[in-house]
């Protein structure tokens, strides 16, 4: 009995000590330091008009490069030339792959590696069936109150026009940067991305290695982490991989009045159901752990604050909670989802083939080959043929060091355009042109101070004018 009592007492003491340690760590957690941002400068003259005009030119990049609307892209080039005369007088311009551009602004110290500011100006199309759901013309560039509407307002003409406005304004003040600044603009990021590939090839031919590359992708968010009651700067330091797989079933069809027990559609449907039921492994990556650590002291949700400040004990719980939300799930696991289904030619014909396209965004530490094998095991049916397809696939990218001066410079600039920002490293769940630039720089980051971008790739894409102001100030800080 004495031994039992001693054991029970020891267990109780251990629980009390453990609980005390957890509570001490929780209550002692320090919030990220607050910082008052500088006042936003007034927009340059005609800046809003220029953004509106840019949006009104429908630079849609088709999946088939041969079907590009050259006249529209040439119109956009003419717009840039007329809107930004100082840039076209003082900077050299290379036209790459027909419609991508590299502007070179020589710095005072040629020994310094250049800064690359990049964006893309092509956009995705607007679904005809969704036109009636828009409250403004998709390519109208209409300003309503404090917001500008239109395809590309967020993704990604805001970035491009903000960069151009920044440089044009600095040129008018006779400013010369210390290091050379390259402005790199792709014209088909939303399709093949070959413009960016060609730009990087050109820079490699010139033996250029960049100190820093800043592209779209990361943003300011208030809505996604509402319990913080502070804005968070999601600064992209790397990207998940990207791969598309075809699942194909071939089986003799026939007349719909005499169906077999199983058809090609049945087999494929069951395969997709099984695939969606299998969860890829969940892991907290090192940058994601740093992300959670930085926000942990500012949470107003006590259970969440306790869990985040004691990941050594609650990591499983945090993984579970993050997995309940689509944004959180994308941060901790490879995602696999069907995006296209094809089968059948008539209502009274049983098809002999059923095909699905499945898109995957691959967590760093995993590979395309491993995900293909995961799909094969999940489906577990040799009648379903699985292969990689699509015009583009890439393994997860290397990561930029979030302790580097490059990350700090972007974090400091983000903190100077919005009050009380918490800058965090973020593994991008989408693919951008910047992945190509890792061949010429170890300092690739993804960020533009847009706040919870609305409607991009969807309905009523729109940008608060204040975000446009922030973007111009952000790029000015990076250059200066």
Where are these regions (language model features)?
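Acidic/histidine-rich catalytic neighborhood of metal-dependent amide-processing enzymes
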Residues: 147-234
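N-terminal Sec-pathway targeting helices
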Residues: 1-16
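Short amphipathic alpha-helices in soluble, non-transmembrane regions
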Residues: 262-263, 371-379
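An extended, acidic, His-containing surface patch that forms the Zn2+-binding/catalytic region
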Residues: 93-95, 102-104, 108-112, 221-222, ...
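A common structural junction motif
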Residues: 121-122, 275-280, 376-385
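Acidic/His- and Gly-rich active-site-bordering loop/insert found
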Residues: 14-151, 170-177
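Midchain, well-structured core segments that form catalytic/ion-binding scaffolds
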Residues: 197, 205-369
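Short, solvent-exposed loop/turn and secondary-structure capping segments
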Residues: 65-66, 126-131, 194-196, 224-227, ...
